[in-house]
Amino acid sequence: MISMASDGTNHRFCESCSKQKRCFSCTLPAMNGRLLSDDRFQCNRCSARRLTPQQTRQLLTELRATLHEMYGFEATHKIVLRLISQKAMEKISNDTRSLGCMKVDINKKTFTQGRKERTEIKWTCTLYLLTDLPDIIAAKVMAHELTHDYLYHHAGRGNDPKVTEGICEAVSGAFLESRKFNGYLEAMKKNPDPVYGAGFRLIFPQLKRYGFKGILERYRSSFTPF
């Protein structure tokens, strides 16, 4: 049996080994590893690269600065990072496969001053991330979710999941490519998912050709401003 890991590498397993528990991080079967408190299994290789909460927060700061350099993403507005269990993630994202989820709450208040009305908008941005993610996977997921944050602020609510997720996957892929993590990029290109995989294959070549601002203009009609 041949299995592809999340880093795009292929691994051959005998029938017995292929039936072992699969690591939630790299998706490969493994005999040796550890069971997390929420029943996720993590192989020894991924466990050795897992980030502590402090390291995860530092990576988020560095990644925001990198995406600001690459595409002009804001790097200063407050984003709360919450490291949570698999069960909590399923409730927040409504997806059993999700490794991360960006939630943006918008509170609008309108004030009347004489004959004029003034509207204030308060944004509350929270990035939910699974605990114990290895460094590269954590960066990949956060780059995706930070793109959601940018789209919320500058485009609005996405009307076409393939376009919205495709843009987020494309930015994540561009970050991975900039760091020479080409195996992860290849895995994204081969992803059979009709939303994430197909969206990436649609948007990534256009991102390289037109740039991020060009992508926003081309797909502006796919979003509804808040």
Question: What positions do the PLM features span?
Answer:
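Hydrophobic (often cysteine-bearing) scaffold residues that line and stabilize catalytic clefts
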Residues: 56-59, 138-139, 143, 160, ...
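Post-HExxH zinc-binding segment in Zn-dependent metallohydrolases
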Residues: 154-196
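Active-site recognition of the HExxH zinc-binding catalytic motif
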Residues: 67, 140-154, 165-169
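Cys/His-rich zinc-coordinating modules
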Residues: 65, 91-102, 132, 171-172, ...
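Pan-zinc metallopeptidase signature
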Residues: 15-34, 193-226
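Second-shell loop/turn segments in exported
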Residues: 48-55, 128-132, 155-158
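Active-site scaffold of zinc-dependent metalloenzymes
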Residues: 95-139, 146-153
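A metal-dependent hydrolase signature that marks the N-terminal structural subdomain at the beginning
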Residues: 1-113
